[in-house]
């Protein structure tokens, strides 16, 4: 420490201490005077700060928010620019996309200029202003927030990330309008949501990083490698993000560094670079330095001291046993929360600039432009400019002959021409901010602002046919003119009455659609409650069914309609009044209990003919086609589905009605119980009523065990009957018996009964009602029921003879004269003609009107015009075009007086001719300009007539939605412009981008796919004749440097500084494995992932035995995959997919050597880092004199010898080391 103190002479610093200077001051004290004195100084600085802060009493008041006076003039200038852009758009000089981009850039530049004005205003007029002191010192807030307080909020983004082209020109001091407030709310919400999500994402990123690198520990002093990486300035589009001096600090040199001019040795190999030495190296003009790096370190599964370099916390070489992997993970993960959230601390304010502007340093003239270095280009604002093909220079000469040379890089857009005069601080060129800017294809719809006729100008169209439709795409950009006029759409069924060149007045009928009936009948017009007519019915037939009437009654607690005939038979109506009916529809059902049973049972047909399939609209019953009988053997079926232990009766028991079968389930009838059981569960209990006849011996008739017994027939043991019965043979445990069951016979007579005579009208009709008997059950079906069922239903079914889809039949109730509660049943057949809803009371002018020609109740013949819909001209004019195309509806264009404009020119000379297209602002005569765009249609001696039109510029590649000469209505799409749009900042930067790089995602739309680059470079090295190991190592190194640069670009773009070495440690873990293609005699399987060093050692050993080496390819693993494929299965299992990892480890018999921190923490041992790290000898006996403390962790013989002496199955490096130290003591 004394040595260090003598070197550092106190020096006087005369600077304004802001955050950066304060950081430098404390680092200087720490480097030179040690941790205690630096801490003491920091304490004193804090006290000093607080002392003066409290004395000054800095606080914010409304008066401190000073708005720069130049704001108003700046806004007025910007609004003028916007107006000029709008005018260009109206003249058809720029496309909708270019207009949008120009408006956004104009406002963005205004906002930036205002920000500079704010800074300048504060510094010049009020340097001690509280707001500026806080923001510029870094104590609180930043420039972006101050800009919003006293400048303008600027442009905002909507929820989809699209920029709203209406900026917020006010600031918080002036206050926001309602519109401003609403536009602001998008960004504010996004900010809140984003903060919550980013925190979670950042935490997960840190977890993955820690998992992938937790076993990277400094295990030795020097790995003796002679390899390294070249350090140079990190540049992104001409801007140095990390300079060489900053990058060199804390690294160890891989080779001697000599002065390029004097050839003196500046620094030697393996020397660590202090900030002072770094300054010397850069001062000598050296641009590239070879340094040692974690990615080129030869240590197995660790990093050596020299390859890592300084521990940046202490400013000296890293200690042995330092867990640098964890430090690296935290260093990368922790700033993750700051990444994209930076945008949203400012409430979603848009600040992204796509181009860096180059300003003229002096007033003067552009001279000696080398035209060959440039090509013509149209800028994103629609202006003509030049773009550089190679790096070049431009010269500006002032009036005093003073020359100023400006260097332009390749791809810079020059906005001025040769010989053009420029003023100081004028934008003369733009260079792209990032040459790696992500773009996406976007579309913008161009919508017509007026109705009229389409005319193409300088437009080349290419048609491509798809199966369904034709796409028209512009090959060259050009103008679409819309000639103003009134456009009327005509339906396909309408007749156009007017002709081309006809004169029209307001109210002239242009086209007419006639509504015609197909059937004769009586007209019925339906009118809604709101007096609008919706449809007209032509009734072709209406029959009242005689001899019956309808009334309402309550059945089953529900009000229903009842149809009663003269014979007092009642039908329950299933239809509702005015219901449309189809053929086979069941209108009503006879209310009768004739065929109602008391319980379930077995049904058998006797001489009964029924339909084979179920009939009716619902297909729910079989139609009975002829008279006959139904035999009914009743039985009561209880569906139980309970355990057999819960049943209270046994199979074959004779039970009385009311017997409890299962808890709370009782029998309704007496009889013999049959229990149907399956798998210990009682499914059903059947109670069969009847008489029992015991048999003295077992029944020998094997053919039949059940059947019908007719009167006079005898059964076994002389059993006879005087009526039809059903018998069953039942074998009981005690003795067999026969059960005689009663049979009920239901007679089904002929359907043609007296009931139908009145119901069917006498004269032939298209709609009839017929009686149909139906049964829902098949012959022999067992009906499971307790309550009973209707075996046969008698239905009233509609029979409709016509099959015309235009005719509809319906059931109507018409009130009887005798009383309100009784109705006649009417069957009507009618044709419905639907019309657009007509408001009877409406009288104002409209484009189309419908007139009803017939009257309600009138009888009309077929093909009478019932109504006509007319399209009416709204104003006076001339029919100019009647347009019809096969895929579009017909349209009529009427040119009115308001579509033309006449200029009185007096004796002035006309500068235009008939047919010319002119744009707003163009001269018609020497001293008269037109305020409208259009086409000159007439020139007389004293006047010029202009047909008003509107030009729309479309770029090449646009998708056209209209044809030349087509007619278009206002608000319809003319074309879709296809363009490349820069992706929003938070997509190409921030956490998602970092995650994409570190997870090595195989993105298709990204400029660089790291996997492809790795494969390509590996194949290239193999082709060049390099050995497998060298090709893999070099291709890995290429991708490592690329990944490090990519990560650094993202962090630097957000203003976060991270040392390269942290990223290198992570990237080393991602690029350490190779995939076996052919294991040959090594014992490895194809597809297996193995460490590059390990497979190379195996291959060397195999070569010594004259066996075939394994072939492999390098693979890039994302951090998640690298964590799961780590050597330690305990670590991998504790990360993700625990079951899978442990199963695979068990199957392949893996060993865990407990080298990392995580495995040891899980097992509950001391971690092998810090104090737990053992500085033990190499097994080969190399001493500590050289400070080469490499651990030989792979000596199989050592482990096997130790195993004999140890009971513990868990063995790590430390145990082995203790064993060796004990042996050496002996």
UniProtKB/Swiss-Prot annotation:
Keywords per UniProt: Chloroplast, DNA-directed RNA polymerase, Metal-binding, Nucleotidyltransferase, Plastid, Transcription, Transferase, Zinc
Binding site for Zn(2+): 223, 297, 304, 307
InterPro entries per the UniProt record, alphabetical: DNA-dir_RpoC2_beta_pp, DNA-dir_RpoC_beta_prime, RNA_pol_Rpb1_3, RNA_pol_Rpb1_3_sf, RNA_pol_Rpb1_4, RNA_pol_Rpb1_5, Rpb1_funnel_sf
One example of a Gene Ontology biological process annotation: DNA-templated transcription
Compartments in which it is found: Plastid, Chloroplast
Cofactor comment: Binds 1 Zn(2+) ion per subunit.
The protein's assembly and partners: In plastids the minimal PEP RNA polymerase catalytic core is composed of four subunits: alpha, beta, beta', and beta''. When a (nuclear-encoded) sigma factor is associated with the core the holoenzyme is formed, which can initiate transcription.
Assigned protein family: Belongs to the RNA polymerase beta' chain family. RpoC2 subfamily.
Designated name of the protein: DNA-directed RNA polymerase subunit beta''
Species whose genome carries this gene: Pyropia yezoensis
Taxonomic path: Eukaryota, Rhodophyta, Bangiophyceae, Bangiales, Bangiaceae
């Amino acid at each position: 420490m004394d040595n260090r103190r003598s070197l550092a002479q106190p020096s006087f610093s005369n600077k304004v201490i802001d955050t950066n200077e304060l950081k430098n001051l404390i680092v200087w004290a720490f480097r030179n005077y040690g941790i205690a004195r630096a801490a003491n100084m920091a304490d004193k600085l804090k006290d000093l700060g607080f002392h003066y802060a409290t004395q000054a009493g800095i606080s914010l008041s409304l008066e401190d928010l000073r708005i720069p006076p130049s704001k108003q003039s700046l806004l007025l200038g910007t609004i003028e620019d916007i107006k000029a852009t709008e005018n260009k758009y109206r003249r058809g000089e720029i496309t909708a996309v270019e207009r949008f981009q120009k408006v956004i850039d104009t406002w963005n530049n205004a906002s930036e200029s205002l920000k500079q004005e704010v800074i300048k205003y504060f510094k010049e007029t009020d340097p001690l202003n509280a707001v500026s002191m806080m923001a510029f010192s870094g104590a609180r807030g930043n420039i972006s927030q101050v800009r919003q307080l006293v400048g303008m909020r600027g442009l905002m983004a909507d929820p989809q990330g699209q920029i709203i082209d209406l900026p917020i020109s006010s600031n918080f001091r002036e206050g926001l309008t309602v519109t401003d407030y609403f536009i602001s709310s998008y960004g504010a919400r996004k900010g809140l949501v984003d903060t919550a999500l980013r925190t979670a994402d950042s935490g997960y990123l840190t977890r993955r990083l820690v998992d992938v690198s937790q076993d990277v520990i400094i295990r030795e002093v020097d790995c003796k490698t002679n390899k390294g990486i070249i350090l140079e300035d990190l540049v992104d589009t001409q801007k140095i993000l990390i300079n060489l001096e900053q990058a060199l600090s804390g690294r160890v040199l891989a080779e001697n560094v000599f002065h390029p001019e004097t050839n003196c040795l500046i620094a030697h190999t393996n020397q660590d670079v202090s900030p002072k030495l770094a300054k010397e190296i850069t001062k000598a003009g050296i641009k590239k330095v070879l340094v040692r790096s974690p990615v080129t370190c030869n240590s197995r599964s660790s990093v050596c001291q020299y390859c890592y370099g300084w521990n940046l916390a202490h400013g000296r070489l890293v200690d042995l046993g330092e867990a640098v992997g964890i430090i690296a993970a935290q260093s990368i993960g922790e700033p993750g929360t700051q990444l994209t959230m930076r945008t949203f601390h400012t409430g979603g304010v848009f600040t992204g600039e796509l181009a860096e502007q180059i300003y003229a340093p002096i007033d003067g003239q552009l001279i000696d432009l080398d035209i060959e270095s440039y090509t013509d280009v149209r800028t994103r604002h629609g202006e003509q400019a030049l773009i550089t093909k190679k790096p070049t220079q431009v010269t500006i000469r002032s009036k005093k002959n003073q020359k100023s040379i400006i260097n332009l890089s390749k791809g810079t857009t020059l906005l001025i021409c040769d010989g053009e005069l420029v003023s100081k601080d004028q934008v003369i060129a733009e260079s792209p901010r990032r040459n790696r800017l992500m773009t996406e294809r976007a579309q913008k719809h161009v919508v017509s602002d007026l109705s009229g006729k389409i005319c193409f100008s300088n437009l080349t169209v290419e048609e491509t046919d798809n199966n369904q439709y034709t796409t028209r795409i512009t090959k060259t950009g050009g103008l679409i003119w819309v000639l103003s006029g009134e456009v009327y759409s005509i339906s396909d069924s309408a007749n156009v009455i007017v002709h081309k060149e006809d004169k029209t007045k307001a109210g002239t009928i242009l086209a007419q659609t006639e509504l015609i009936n197909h059937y004769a009948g009586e007209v019925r017009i339906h009118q809604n409650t709101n007096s609008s007519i919706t449809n007209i019915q032509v009734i072709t037939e209406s029959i009242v069914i005689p001899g019956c009437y309808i009334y309402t009654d309550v059945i089953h607690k529900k009000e229903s309609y009842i149809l009663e005939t003269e014979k007092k038979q009642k039908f329950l109506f299933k239809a509702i009044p005015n219901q449309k009916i189809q053929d086979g529809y069941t209108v009503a059902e006879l209310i009768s209990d004739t065929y109602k049973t008391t319980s379930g049972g077995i049904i058998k047909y006797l001489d009964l003919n029924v339909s084979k399939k179920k009939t009716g609209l619902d297909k729910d019953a079989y139609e009975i086609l002829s008279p006959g009988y139904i035999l009914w053997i009743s039985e009561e079926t209880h569906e139980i589905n309970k355990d057999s232990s819960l049943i209270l009766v046994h199979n074959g028991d004779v039970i009385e009605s009311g017997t409890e079968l299962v808890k709370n389930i009782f029998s309704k009838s007496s009889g013999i119980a049959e229990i149907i059981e399956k798998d210990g569960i009682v499914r059903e209990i059947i109670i069969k009523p009847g008489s029992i006849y015991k048999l003295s011996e077992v029944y020998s008739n094997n053919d039949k065990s059940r059947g019908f017994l007719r009167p006079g027939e005898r059964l076994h043991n002389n059993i006879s009957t005087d009526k039809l019965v059903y018998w069953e043979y039942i074998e009981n445990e005690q003795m067999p018996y026969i059960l005689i069951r009663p049979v009920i016979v239901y007679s089904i007579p002929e359907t043609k009964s007296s009931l139908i005579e009145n119901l069917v009208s006498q004269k032939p009709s298209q709609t009839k009602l017929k009686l149909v008997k139906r049964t829902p059950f098949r012959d022999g079906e067992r009906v499971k029921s307790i309550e009973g069922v209707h075996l046969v239903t008698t239905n009233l079914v509609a029979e409709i003879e016509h099959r015309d889809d235009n005719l509809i039949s319906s059931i109507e109730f018409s009130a009887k004269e005798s009383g309100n509660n009784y109705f006649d049943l009417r069957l009507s057949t009618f044709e419905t003609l639907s019309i657009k809803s007509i408001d009877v009371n409406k009288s104002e002018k409209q484009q189309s009107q419908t007139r009803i020609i017939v009257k309600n109740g009138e009888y009309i013949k077929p093909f009478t015009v019932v109504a006509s819909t007319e399209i009416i001209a709204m104003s006076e004019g001339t029919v100019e075009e009647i347009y019809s195309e096969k895929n579009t509806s017909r349209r009529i264009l009427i040119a009115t007086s308001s579509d033309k404009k006449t200029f009185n020119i007096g004796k002035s000379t006309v500068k235009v001719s008939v047919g010319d297209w002119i744009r707003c602002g163009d001269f018609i005569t020497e001293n008269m300009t037109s305020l409208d765009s259009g086409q000159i249609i007439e020139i007389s001696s004293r006047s010029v007539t202009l047909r008003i039109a509107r030009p729309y510029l479309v770029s090449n590649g646009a998708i056209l939605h209209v044809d030349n000469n087509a007619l278009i209505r206002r608000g319809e799409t003319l074309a879709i412009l296809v363009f490349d749009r820069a992706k929003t900042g938070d997509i190409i930067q921030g956490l998602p981008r970092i995650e994409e790089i570190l997870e090595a995602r195989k993105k298709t739309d990204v400029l660089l796919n790291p996997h492809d680059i790795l494969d390509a470079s590996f194949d290239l090295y193999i082709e060049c004749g390099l050995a497998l190991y060298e090709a893999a190592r070099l291709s890995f190194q290429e991708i490592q440097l690329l990944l490090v640069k990519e990560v650094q670009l993202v962090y630097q773009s957000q203003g976060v500084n991270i040392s390269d070495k942290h990223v290198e440690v992570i990237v080393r873990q991602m690029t350490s494995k190779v995939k076996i293609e052919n294991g040959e005699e090594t014992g490895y399987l194809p597809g297996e992932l193995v460490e590059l060093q390990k497979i190379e050692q195996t291959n060397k050993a195999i070569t010594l035995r004259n066996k075939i080496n394994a072939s492999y390819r390098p693979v890039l693993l994302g951090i998640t995959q690298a964590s799961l494929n780590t050597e330690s299965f305990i670590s991998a299992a504790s990360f993700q997919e625990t079951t899978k990892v442990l199963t695979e480890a068990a199957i392949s018999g893996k060993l865990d050597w407990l080298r990392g921190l995580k495995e040891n923490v899980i097992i509950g041992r001391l971690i092998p880092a810090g104090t737990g790290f053992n500085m033990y000898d190499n097994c080969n006996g190399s001493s500590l004199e050289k400070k080469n403390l490499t651990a030989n962790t792979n000596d199989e013989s050592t482990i096997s010898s130790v195993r004999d002496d140890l009971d513990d199955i868990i063995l790590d490096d430390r145990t082995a080391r203790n064993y060796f130290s004990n042996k050496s003591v002996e």
